[in-house]
Amino acid sequence: MAIELRECAGIAQFNTGSSKCLLDPGKVKAIILTMHGYKLPANATAELLEAACHDDRPNRIFPIKTIIEYAPSGGEANKNATGYGPNKITSYSAKDDVWTVDEYDASLKANIMAAKGVAFDAYFVDENNVVYGINDGTDILAGIPLAGIYPGGQDWDSSGTEANLTVGTMFKDYEKYVKNADYRVYKFDVVEALKGLVYVELVKQDTGENNYKLKEHFGNLDVTSFFGAALSEGASSCFDGEVSAVKFENGNLVITATGTPSLKSPKVLQENGVVGIEQWKA
């Protein structure tokens, strides 16, 4: 009769050797957020990552860049002794790291604040095009589950410090992450390929029957000149609202339509050469 034997869980899969070529972790330059359970594209290329940034939800990835400072916090062993016995590890403290972004961005801060209840997965990208995640037993690198993200930093300049933005990442289970940590190394500029989206609005002008401006939702910045040429080339491919013609002239988008024009999805825009924007919907 077969006898089932128990293995010691602590050392059943335990070794202390080193890789023939140890990875030298670089400075993290970007964070990629995904909806929980969703992953980066398999066999990722720069083109696939850019497309994923513009994909329809929930497949879309959400990059935050460029990171210029890292302040780790937590993830330390919690120890406790019973009576006069030795200390034993009972658990690990919550891991709550803070990342500083290179420029203060009120729009990004507002978006992160609004997502306080969302449990994202996260990938971290370093300066050497290494993407860090976890091994979930499949061939595709998975993101690190987070309990949440939050913004911080300083909203205005002071005598010694300029306004700055930080992003906090709260690990859902730091011990599980360390046990399953993994990474992929790419041969293209991962950070450059990442294109976060900005909310914009199409605003009809009083001057000219068909004149429109494109403005950022947060801050009302006129960005017509940045996207006007590409949107006019895409014409009806970039717009809903039964648009028949689009011209970019004198700083305006001149849109001929029988309905109310609005931008198509970021996925469609990106396929037509318009990168980095999404129509704001109240």
Name each model-derived stretch:
Residues 1-65:
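Polar/acidic, low-complexity leader/linker segments enriched in S/T/G and N/D
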Residues 43-154, 160-163, 174-190:
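Extracellular/virion structural assembly segments
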Residues 101, 124, 168, 210-216, ...:
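Generic recognition of long tandem-repeat/solenoid scaffolds
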Residues 106-111, 126-136, 220-225, 260-265, ...:
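Short, surface-exposed beta-strand/loop "edge" segments at domain boundaries and coil↔beta transitions
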Residues 165-171:
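C-terminal edge-of-domain segments
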Residues 188-210:
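Beta-strand-rich domain onsets/edges
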Residues 204-226:
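Beta-strand-rich structural segments
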Residues 225-282:
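The feature marks long extracellular or luminal low-complexity segments
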